[in-house]
From Swiss-Prot:
Homodimer. Binds to stalled ribosomes, contacting rRNA. Endonuclease that is involved in the suppression of homologous recombination and thus may have a key role in the control of bacterial genetic diversity. Acts as a ribosome collision sensor, splitting the ribosome into its 2 subunits. Detects stalled/collided 70S ribosomes which it binds and splits by an ATP-hydrolysis driven conformational change. Acts upstream of the ribosome quality control system (RQC), a ribosome-associated complex that mediates the extraction of incompletely synthesized nascent chains from stalled ribosomes and their subsequent degradation. Probably generates substrates for RQC. It comes from the Bacteria. SMART domains: MUTSac, MUTSd, SMR. The keyword RNA-binding applies. Residues 681-756 form the Smr domain. This is Endonuclease MutS2. One of its GO terms (biological process) is mismatch repair. GO terms for molecular function: ATP binding; ATP hydrolysis activity; ATP-dependent DNA damage sensor activity; endonuclease activity; mismatched DNA binding; ribosomal large subunit binding; rRNA binding. Belongs to the DNA mismatch repair MutS family. MutS2 subfamily. InterPro entries: DNA_mismatch_repair_MutS_C, DNA_mismatch_repair_MutS_core, DNA_mismatch_repair_MutS_sf, MSSS, MutS, MutS2, P-loop_NTPase, Smr_dom. CDD domains: ABC_MutS2.
Length: 757
């Protein structure tokens, strides 16, 4: 029996498939099934989720499904030009993805996808031999270039002769034109005049008035053209075979890359699904605890989060209550989330959720009925339960929905209790739903079982779909009947038919529900107040930081004015020292020292104020005692990587001070003596006209800084910007050479330029 299907596992996988970027990922997701060791998959998904949150989308351009090309390769056929382009684009995408992931901080992703094999030589060869429009390039071989050159010359000669023929034989032609059919130039000759032309008749018009003839003088020319076309076809076939053989000789590596990209696509879809639905990665634990768990198949605007915990000293939860109250969804979610976690999927829940590994997950859900086998509801359930009981052990998670239903309530309850006892003796973990009172009582008195119910609003006579732990559910039949208008005497008659014990139990359950509902409501109010308090606290902290920054800026301004004043006074005192008497000179010197000490104390106080703030990625900083302002690009432990424009330096955090706003502005404007020059520029999105002064300035900077090589990032797009850049570089005498980048440099989206230095 496929218990995963009963738990809606395939439907959730289909939801995740929507986030793949190729069919490779879809097929990989279909292979995922629960395993007792899902750690590696979960860690990979977690790292990729962190990647998406911090860096955005990974580079996946060109990573399409090349399975059809692989099948053709294995069959021994040569790939067509457009197929080779697809494979080349895929392999270039593999290189780009590998380079991106290996330079990030995610260890598992690095280890896994550093195994992608580079096909740099093949990619270069395809780029050389095949144009982007799918035509084999003249660069592919000298022979192909020569054949095409001959074809062009011969075509020019034939067309000239054909034009002359039309001009000189206009009286015998039906129209003043010629046609090219099946590799031959033909002329529409009037049928009555066909004997006046020596040549071969190829076609006759439907009316019979025109014959399409190949004059004798064109036969040899056409034969030569056909021969050149055949030579061209053979040479192209040879080139395509050569490129295909490059792949065939590395077929295992190609298959490995396809498998790795399928895996990455699958991980990407799972991480994307989590990111868009506020999901998290839950690692295996020794407990079962759901915190705001949301069933993926229920729309966001309708789903009610589930909170449920199985204490360590319990082996099962018995959930009771009215129909349509959410019991089935609750137990299904426990089984589904366990299966998803064990298969390497993220879960839609909050931090604090814990789930155990179960080698066996078995379920019988009420809505699954063997109608095709013509079995009754009870027989349908019992058939599955027999199989579950037979296979259950201490490694089993068992989900049973509406246990004991579909038959006489007394016998059904007795059978349900016996089944629960047997499963507990075997050590299985149980999540059971029922509406039978004897089962509720049994659960209340059993040390390994926990009672739970679905909350019911007596005012609206509708379920809230929230789980209440520790109290069994009531049927609420009398309340609902009374609310809907059933006469009171009938309801009282019904009550009188209940035994004293049943009435007391129902009253006790109702009282417990009311008390727990009130407590839950109070708990929700407190939680809401706590959240509002945390928001206010965050706001006040932010306001305090803003106010503090303003005060520091005011202090900096005052300090600057004081420094200016001290410099002015010092200058006047220095001038006075030269003309004053010795006693006066000594006194003046003391005054200067006092003023300088005050200035240093004020500066020290300002620096200490700066140091109190935490340094993060993106902050502008300067080294202690220095004036150069840099930008923090990475923080690891107690060390930061700081970009000072002309170089990057690792500096202990204790040696860094946050720059003032004015210093940041100065850095951006370039007024500090810190070079902001880079060996690359990004002109994507510019027109050729907008890019021209930027490119020329870049060449100036390369030459002035004595740097031989630079990188111009223009993107691939239509190629218009790249063409414009090359035209600018071609006219600049300082440029020694330029070319497109290698795959690792950015491919055709980057131009690498070398200048004289």
């Amino acid at each position: 029996m496929d218990y995963l299907e009963v738990l809606d596992f395939p439907k959730v996988v289909d939801l995740v498939k929507r986030h793949t970027f190729s069919d490779l990922g879809k097929r990989h997701l279909d292979t995922l099934k629960p395993t007792v060791n899902p750690w590696n998959e979960l860690e990979l998904v977690e790292e990729l989720l962190n990647y998406l949150t911090r860096w955005g989308e990974p580079p996946i351009k060109g990573l399409s499904d090349i399975t059809p090309e692989m099948e053709k390769l294995k069959a021994g056929s040569s790939l067509e030009p457009w197929e080779l382009l697809r494979v080349s684009s895929f392999l270039e995408g593999c290189d780009i993805l590998k380079n991106d992931l290996t330079r990030r901080e995610y260890q598992k992703l690095k280890e896994t996808f550093s195994q992608l094999v580079s096909f740099e030589e093949f990619v270069k060869e395809v780029n050389r031999c095949i144009e982007q429009n799918g035509e084999v390039s003249n660069r592919a071989s000298p022979k192909l270039k020569e054949i095409r050159s001959e074809k062009r010359s011969l075509s020019t000669e034939i067309k000239k002769r054909a034009d002359d023929f039309v001009k000189n034989h206009s009286q015998i032609l039906q129209e003043q034109m010629y046609v090219y059919r099946d590799g031959r130039y033909l002329f529409p000759v009037k049928a009555s005049m066909k004997r006046s032309v020596r040549g071969i008749v190829h076609h006759l018009s439907s009316s019979g008035a025109t014959v399409f003839m190949e004059p004798e003088e064109f036969v040899e020319l056409n034969n030569r053209m056909r021969l050149l076309e055949e030579e061209e076809r053979l040479e192209i076939s040879r080139i395509l075979r050569h490129l295909t053989n490059m792949l065939l000789s590395n077929l295992k590596d190609l298959e490995k890359n396809i498998d790795l990209i399928a895996h990455f696509d699958s991980l990407y879809a799972r991480a994307k699904f989590a990111k868009e639905n506020n999901g998290i990665v839950v690692k295996p634990s020794s407990r079962i605890k759901l915190v705001n768990a949301r069933h993926p198949l229920i729309p966001k605007d309708r789903v009610v989060p589930i909170n449920l915990e199985l204490p360590p000293n319990k082996k099962g939860v018995i959930i009771t209550g009215p129909n349509m109250g959410g019991k089935t969804v609750t137990v299904k979610t426990v089984g589904l989330f366990t299966a998803l976690m064990m298969s390497g999927f993220p879960l839609l829940c909050d931090e604090g959720t814990e789930l155990k590994i179960f080698p066996k997950i078995m379920a019988d859900i009420g809505e699954e009925q063997s109608i095709e086998q013509s079995l009754s509801t009870f027989s349908s359930h019992m058939k599955r339960i027999v199989e579950i009981v037979r296979n259950a052990d201490s490694d089993s998670l068992v989900i049973l929905d509406e246990l004991g239903s579909g038959t006489d309530p007394v016998e059904g309850a007795a059978l349900a209790i016996a089944i629960i006892e047997d499963l507990l003796e075997k050590g299985a973990t149980l999540f059971v739903t029922t509406h039978l009172t004897p089962v509720k009582v049994f659960a209340m008195n059993h040390p390994l079982l926990l009672n739970a119910s679905m909350e019911f609003d007596p005012e609206t006579l509708s379920p809230t779909y929230r789980v209440l732990v520790g109290v069994p559910g009531g049927s609420h039949a009398f309340q609902i009947a009374e609310k809907l208008g059933l006469e009171k005497r009938i309801i009282e008659n019904a009550r009188s038919r209940l035994s004293q014990e049943e009435m007391e139990l129902e009253g006790l359950i109702r009282s417990l529900h009311e008390k727990i509902s009130l407590l839950e409501e109070e708990k929700r109010k407190l939680q809401k107040e706590k959240e509002e308090y945390m928001k206010l606290r965050a706001k006040y902290e932010e306001d305090y930081k803003k106010l503090r920054r303003m005060k520091i800026e005011e202090f900096d301004k005052e300090l600057k004015e004081l420094n200016d004043y001290i410099r002015k006074v010092k200058k006047e005192l220095d001038q006075a020292i030269h003309v004053a008497k010795s006693g006066s000179v000594e006194e003046m010197r003391k005054t200067v020292k006092t003023l300088e000490k005050e200035r240093e104390d004020l500066k020290k106080k300002a620096i200490e104020e700066e140091a109190e703030e935490e340094i993060n990625v993106g902050d502008h900083v300067r080294m202690e005692g220095g004036t150069s302002v840099g930008k923090v690009v990475e923080v690891k432990g107690n060390t930061a990587l700081v970009d000072f424009g002309f170089l990057r330096v690792k500096v202990p955090l204790g040696k860094l001070k946050k720059a003032k706003k004015k210093e940041e502005e100065d850095r951006e404007k370039g007024t500090h003596f810190v070079s902001s020059f880079r060996t690359e520029i990004d002109i994507r999105g510019m027109t050729v006209e907008e890019a021209e002064p930027v490119v020329k300035k870049f060449i100036d900077d390369l030459v002035m800084n004595g740097i031989k090589k630079g990188y111009i990032i223009h993107g691939k797009g239509t190629g218009k910007l790249a063409t414009g850049v090359w035209e600018i570089l071609r006219k600049d005498r300082r440029v020694v050479s330029f070319r497109f980048g290698t795959p690792s440099e950015g491919g055709t989206g980057v131009t690498v330029v070398e200048v004289e230095v």
